[in-house]
Amino acid sequence: MYLRLYNLYLWTSAVLSAATLTTTSTPGGKDTVVRVPLTKYLNNRAFGAFPGDANFNGAFESYNVADLAGYTGTFSSPQTGTDYNFPASNLTIYDNIVCEGQLIPVPPDQYFSVQFLVASDSRETILANNVTFRFADNTTLETEIRAEPWWAFLTMYKGDLIFPTRFMQNKSDYNTTHIFEVTKAVNPAKTLTAVELPSTTNTTDGRIHVFAMSLNIVSGLVVQNIRPTQKRMDGDTSVQIVEITIGNAGPAWVLGAGVSISLEAPGVKTVKEAKVKRLAPGDQKRVDVAVVADSVSNVTATVKVMSTSETSSFTFPEYEFGLKNYTEDLSSLTLHESPDWFNKAKYGIFIHWGPYAVPGWGNSTPYEVYAEWYWFYTHHPATDKSGSLEYGLRTFGPDVVYDDFFQNFTASKFDPKEWVDLFDAAGAQYFVLTSKHHDGFAIFDTEKTTNRNSLNYGPKRDVLKEVFDAAKKYQPHLHRGTYFSMPEWYNPDFGKYGFATHEGADSLGWPGILARNPYTGEEEPYTGRVPIDDYIEDLQVPQQEILAYKYETEIMWCDCGAANGSAGFMSKWFNEANALGRQITINSRCGIVEGSDFGTPEYLTFSSVSTRKWESSQGMDPYSYGYNRATPDSDYMNASTVVAKLVDMTSKNGNFLLDIGPKADGTIVDVEAQALRAAGVWIKKHAEAIFNTTYWFIEAEEGEHIRFTQTNDAFYILFLEEPVAGQDVVIHAPLPIYDGDIVTVLTEDIEVKWSRGDGGISFSWPKEMAGKGEYCWVLKIGYAA
């Protein structure tokens, strides 16, 4: 279990200094946690006893107070080890703060970080605004606080606290609700006196709610938290990964050879230490220690931090070690995480290809919609701004229905080797191919579940197998993933599970009934359908299993996971993969948020770091994943934008999944291919600043055009706007640069002079860089040995 701090002030008896390492034991191995009482500022009630009892979001919707049965006034975060007052008050009165610019005094001290529990009260809307830290010297620091939705449907966001129900105004709902932990770095050399919350008071746009706030005090170098995961070491699935969080409040730096980190416990031994070569005052890193445990057991662990001559120890009582098989229980599935290869890969190619490429219509800006939704929009004109219904009538006439497009989905020029070679040339590390979209047409062998696939209609080829085989043969470094639609719009076997996304004529939905020709009213065929008893048991889950076991997908990229059999599928797949030594991952859209490894924002990016892994997808088309013939060449994403988005997302712990929509014949729009190749030249030259990097704890960016990434050996400054040759560039963020470090322009082998001043770190951009480079310019700070 996690050490719980029940006093407002509780401090550790010993710390580890980078400059003077001594052999000591710190009870609990934790920093000091100050849990800030918020009672005076509470102005909203989030937890109700019955539908309509509490008004969390202005619509008399709320969390369910019964879901708090296991909480006794304190929550300890497994991710950070931080303790919070939660719930914040007696639950018959206010229990959270709607941010209205409140100024909250805190006990004056030199804090390392400020931690929040937050949520957005707007369904599926991520809110971000600035919180202001006020210091005793009358200076301030503004930093972003981002709140993800308290609940969402289909595209879900996994919270740090997950509750099974939601109260609507008049009824209960069994979609999960969430609260999220946010960590913000504070300059530990300054005395913090107050925290000023942002002002977010518009219920239409959504409001940020704060449920708890805690402050961390660190003295010197401290192991702040350990987290035994169920992740396994690549190449040896008997080895468990333990995540160690180490923070340095200074004043000394971790320099030179740095420190090694290992872990000892009864029945547990370290087989691979972690290394930290550089850690500046105010900085924090999460590193992995690989261990082998004799069995699953709760034991007291000692973490040792070692320099070349001295050691310091930190003790963590009653932590569970050992690898376990997954079960269908949600508390088991939530332990699964994205593997290291995915976290380090950063960049993948998404491919949407199916019969929807035949009409290939989504109109153009500002009337564009997803072209792969053509069938849906022709039957739901109230939801459509693209004029799909009118386009279909004037182009194909009233008697052509969607399944008639199968014969024109020819793949006549489809060359899987050309595809995977393009993915490699683009610099991508993985790809995700749409195995089946919402139209129910699959491009793989669906066996007995349906005949509605590319082996029987259209290309008469196993498209997925051909692409996967080409990748294995010609580009074996590419990881292989599959998009899979959980429901099918017009499959009548889905009828008993049919749903709408919300009430009203403009709702998107999966009715599970046969479509009717929107021009003639006649019932449309569902070509290839075979008799089954249950959609989930006989089609959905078996198709996922085919992808998992026959095609050996490494990424199960679900979409629209409402009704599902995911718990059984996940537990079996996770266990099978572990037994075979395969590192696989699954996204947040399979219907069970607890089992998700990474979030999936769509056509947007986060504006600050998310410590929980995420991947943003969007098309090279302005607003379509499938091929859209209405898009002019000039509107497709260019190489500069590809690089800028990849750099931005990488700096914030995200991956970039960039989509292309091939034509019905299998060719890729030429302007897309050109941009991918051009971006790939830059990506491959600057690979060390992108792949295998991590985010920086203190800041992801400075201003609009500067981003940061790091490895254990170097720190990278990425400029999305070209610096002026012969002039100084000043970075105000507290960069981890020290005397003796070598700064170079990456790929140019040009050394850059630097100096430290009151305003920050100044770099003299070399005159010889005039006219050199494109898209993004990178400085590398190589750490001195």
Residue ranges and their predicted role:
Residues L8-V15, N64, L68, S77, ...:
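Sterically constrained small-residue positions within well-ordered secondary structures
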Residues P198, T203-T204, L215-A785:
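Mature catalytic domains of secreted/periplasmic carbohydrate-active enzymes
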Residues Y2-R4, P27-N55, D67, E181, ...:
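Poly-acidic low-complexity segments
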Residues M1-T24:
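Fungal secretory targeting signals
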Residues S17-A19, A49, K158-G159, T165, ...:
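Amphipathic alpha-helical interaction segments
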Residues L8, V118-S120, K171, E264, ...:
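Intrinsically disordered, low-complexity segments enriched in polar/charged residues with Gly/Pro
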